A protein has these predicted regions:
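Acetyl-CoA-dependent GNAT
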Residues: 5, 9-16, 20-78, 83
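Hydrophobic adenine-recognition pocket in adenosine-nucleotide-binding enzymes
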Residues: 10, 85-87, 120, 136
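Short hydrophobic/aromatic beta-strand or adjacent loop that forms the aromatic wall/cage
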Residues: 49-51, 140-144
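Conserved acetyl-CoA-binding loop-helix of GNAT-fold acetyltransferases
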Residues: 87, 93-106, 133
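Conserved active-site alpha-helix within GNAT-family acetyltransferase domains
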Residues: 98, 122-141
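Conserved GNAT acetyl-CoA-binding A-motif
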Residues: 101, 108-120
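Terminal substrate-recognition subdomain of acyl/acetyltransferases
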Residues: 106, 143-150
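Conserved beta-strand-loop-alpha-helix junction that forms the acyl-donor binding cleft
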Residues: 118-127, 146-149
Length: 150
């Protein structure tokens, strides 16, 4: 019987691979300690965070992940905000990102979430094509403002 890949909840043992995926696929240089701390924290907050990994069972290796946070506001129904979707470059184009998003959407629907939204930098044209190919529509162009509180 041929082994298959699977989508599952993230585990602390995934930290090293998640760190690598964040660095290579998203361009975020982050310490292993930070990744471990965040996996622990977010895994315990199941009412507000959905964090799934795609594991290639044949290779016994995590090759991608999706992370979404519950989006609540005074002016809309509950939704999800995608905070990260990443797949290692050598595994891109194989439907992994699509499977992760579908898995997330099914679980969100089961939890009565009414929409999923995400932001993507304007230069990430290939990512935009991907999101459109799985049914997402660009409904707004905006700028991000940030203020550091340290």
């Amino acid at each position: 019987m041929e082994e298959q890949s699977m989508i599952r909840n993230i585990k602390i043992e995934d930290a090293e691979t998640i760190q690598r995926i964040c660095n290579i696929s998203l361009g975020y240089s982050v310490s292993i300690e930070t990744v471990m701390r965040q996996i622990q924290k977010l895994s315990e907050d199941v009412n507000h965070h959905y964090v799934y990994v795609y594991e290639d069972e044949k290779l016994q290796k995590v090759v991608g992940f999706v992370h979404a946070e519950v989006y609540e506001s005074l002016y809309s129904y509950s939704g999800l905000n995608i905070l990260g979707l990443a797949v290692l470059p050598e595994f891109q184009g194989k439907g992994i990102g699509k499977e992760l998003m579908y898995y997330l959407e099914v679980n969100a629907k089961n939890d009565s979430v009414l929409f999923v939204r995400l932001n993507s930098a304007d230069y990430r044209v290939e990512a935009h094509k991907f999101y459109e190919s799985i049914g997402y529509v660009c409904d707004k162009t905006q700028k991000r403002f940030i203020k550091r509180l340290d």
